[in-house]
Amino acid sequence: MPINQPSGQIKLTNVSLVRLKKARKRFEVACYQNKVQDYRKGIEKDLDEVLQIHQVFMNVSKGLVANKEDLQKCFGTTNVDDVIEEIMHKGEIQLSEKERQLMLNKVNNEMLTIVSAKCINPVSKKRYPPTMIHKALQELKFSPVINKPAKLQALEAIKLLVSKQIIPIVRAKMKVKVAISEPSRQPELIEKISKLIASSPGESTKPELDPWTCTGLIDPVNYRDLMTLCDKKGTVQVLDMAVIDNTTHN
């Protein structure tokens, strides 16, 4: 819907507003739709490609431009670029209902894709499709929000699904390869690493060989512990972030 500006200014259409309240005053900038998130993520770095008008407003819909006195009082500067930067990074995006729903759908789809990629059925060793993940989360009354990264929400969803088990589900194991130098001097380290990694016969070398290597599966929750153990003493290579069974059965 167009926003009417005072005579002499262009009419703005397809506007996304970013609003920041400071010192009991409201400041707004007018942006192109879908450009704000790109700017915040660093995908778009040119403000001129984001802003419809390179100006700070008190009220965009009424065309009220912020004066220098208010900028100085509230932001400590009259530099419009500095004020715009702060509003862009700290302000709240004012979304229409349609924009909000589109963004929510995008976050939800991204979250479901992550959960599907990281989890498996412990019996079949196969992934669940996003549609089944979505249904399970609906039963658990888990709903995504637009102001939190999809990856973080995916991890929260996984934790809930694994704890409630309304469908049989576990985090898929990671496949890693560890190499430790001078293993004969570090038998305790080798033992600790071996307990974390589930390896098949032949996937680890003898402790007297230098370097000692071990390839196998590890629970993702133990990955940080493994990295800590190997810090400055060896290397950890991730061969597969989520091991699944790709075989088909007739």
From Swiss-Prot:
GO cellular component assignments: cytoplasm; nucleus
Keywords (A to Z) from UniProt: Cytoplasm, Nucleus, Ribosome biogenesis
Keyword Cytoplasm: yes
Major location category of this protein: cytoplasm
InterPro entries reported in the protein's UniProt record: Ribosome_mat_SBDS_CS (IPR018023), Ribosome_mat_SBDS_N_sf (IPR036786), Sdo1/SBDS (IPR002140), Sdo1/SBDS-like (IPR039100), SDO1/SBDS_C (IPR046928), SDO1/SBDS_central (IPR018978), Sdo1/SBDS_central_sf (IPR037188), SDO1/SBDS_N (IPR019783)
Biological-process GO terms, alphabetical: cytosolic ribosome assembly
MF-aspect GO terms: 5.8S rRNA binding; guanyl-nucleotide exchange factor activity; large ribosomal subunit rRNA binding; rRNA primary transcript binding; small ribosomal subunit rRNA binding
Subcellular location: Cytoplasm; Nucleus
UniProt cross-references to Pfam families, sorted A to Z: SBDS_C (PF20268), SBDS_domain_II (PF09377), SBDS_N (PF01172)
Miscellaneous comment text of the record: Present with 5060 molecules/cell in log phase SD medium.
Functional summary from the UniProt entry: Involved in the biogenesis of the 60S ribosomal subunit and translational activation of ribosomes. Together with the EF-2-like GTPase RIA1, may trigger the GTP-dependent release of TIF6 from 60S pre-ribosomes in the cytoplasm, thereby activating ribosomes for translation competence by allowing 80S ribosome assembly and facilitating TIF6 recycling to the nucleus, where it is required for 60S rRNA processing and nuclear export.
Family indicated by similarity: Belongs to the SDO1/SBDS family.
Record text on subunit structure and interactions: Associates with the 60S ribosomal subunit.
Protein name: Ribosome maturation protein SDO1
Organism encoding this protein: Saccharomyces cerevisiae (strain ATCC 204508 / S288c)
Gene name linked to the record: SDO1
